[in-house]
Structures are given as C-alpha cells and as structure tokens.
C-alpha cells in the first residue's frame, strides 16, 4: 500500500474509531443501567460494550498518531488494542447468544407448564 493511501486509511480509522468507540461506550452504559435494574448479571453485556469501546478508542488514537508520524510502537499498540476490541466483541457475542438460548428455553418451559396447568385444571366444568 502506498504511503498516501495508508495515511488516508489511518485517518479514517482514527475518526471513525473514535466516534464508534464513543457510541459503544454510550450504548454500553445504557445497556448496563437497564440490565442492572433487573439483575446484577444483566449489566454484564453493557460492561463488555464499555470495555470494547475503550479498546476501540485506544486503537483509533494510535491510528491517528501513526498517521501523523509513522512509528512502529504506534502500529503495535493500534493492533494490540484492536485485537482486544475484537476479543471483547467475541465474548459479548457468546454471552448474548447464551442468554438468548436460555431465554428461549425458559419461554418454552413456561409455555409447557402453562399448557399442562390448563389441561389438568378443573375450572371449566360443564353442567
């Protein structure tokens, strides 16, 4: 990649990474607050989003520094923080899928219990 294209790409990563990181943090805070009202464990996905947003912002900052003056240390830090961001997103995805599966299972269990209760109750007797 030629230096001019790389510089434009790094500037784009810096701008969009900062904006997206801020949005991750805001959405994570909203998710954590809404989840904390129901159960403490409900705040976990929000906390994971906040941490992901922080890593994305750090990666964006290093991309901006790398665009200004190309240093190997900035490149290493940018990639390290981006790797952490991707890992946190993977953990968040796994947690979300697990919670969704548990919610679906609980829904069907309660549905079956409700149907079973309706089958064996004697409230609708005919005369």
From Swiss-Prot:
This is Uncharacterized protein YwnC. GO terms for cellular component: membrane. The gene is ywnC. The chain crosses the membrane at residues 91-113. Keywords: Membrane, Transmembrane, Transmembrane helix. InterPro entries: DUF5362. It is a single-pass membrane protein. It comes from the Bacteria. It is found in: Membrane.
